[in-house]
Swiss-Prot record:
It comes from the Bacteria. It comes from Nitrosomonas eutropha (strain DSM 101675 / C91 / Nm57). The gene is ribH. This is 6,7-dimethyl-8-ribityllumazine synthase. The keyword Glycosyltransferase does not apply. Signal peptide: none annotated. The active site is at H94 (proton donor). Gene3D superfamilies: Lumazine/riboflavin synthase. (2S)-2-hydroxy-3-oxobutyl phosphate binds at E91, T92, R133. Belongs to the DMRL synthase family. GO terms for molecular function: 6,7-dimethyl-8-ribityllumazine synthase activity.
């Protein structure tokens, strides 16, 4: 769909066929993390990503997710990565540190290694909020990963065609 005349618009799609997706999941707040994972992998399958093309790595907590994502990104095997976990507010400042630093780490890895990363780390005030959000957030991260993987591939092809001209 074109919104502006004479402007090239680059669209992406939600076709996951042929994409390889890496998932890093925190084991802290495991019930919520597993709920996110179930919704995410179900949606990935609906989008056409084959089970054999999905790799899951688990880590102790949200702060460990960026390092595991970095190791997956270095392998150059994945079209997109997904971070899953839950940071639930407690009575201390620790929540803010974990929520902010894990998000910062995801962005840093994605930009440094030129790979889309879908952030499925829930940050909520309590377990009830996390439970209420985990299904939609898990599915959403799958859609974001597939769409951004396709967009990155398209933009990469465009970049190669302009440099070879």
């Amino acid at each position: 769909m074109s919104y502006y005349d004479n402007i090239l618009e680059i669209d992406s799609d939600l076709n996951g066929n042929g994409l390889c997706i890496g998932i890093v999941m925190s084991r802290f707040n495991i019930d919520t993390s597993e709920g996110l994972l179930g919704a995410c992998t179900t949606e990935l399958a609906k989008l056409g990503v084959q089970e054999a093309d999905i790799v899951l790595v688990t880590v102790p907590g949200a702060l460990e997710i960026p390092l595991a994502l970095q190791k997956l990104a270095i392998s150059d095997r994945y079209d997109a990565l997904i971070a899953l976990g839950a940071v639930i507010h407690g009575e201390t400042y620790h929540f803010d540190v974990v929520a902010n630093e894990s998000a910062r780490g995801l962005i840093a890895v994605g930009l440094e290694y030129d790979i889309p990363i879908a952030n499925g780390i829930l940050t909520t005030d309590n377990e009830d909020q996390a439970t209420a959000r985990m299904t939609e957030k898990g599915a959403e991260t799958a859609r974001v990963a597939v769409e951004m993987a396709n967009l990155a591939l398209t933009l990469g092809e465009m970049d190669q065609s302009t440099t070879s001209s």
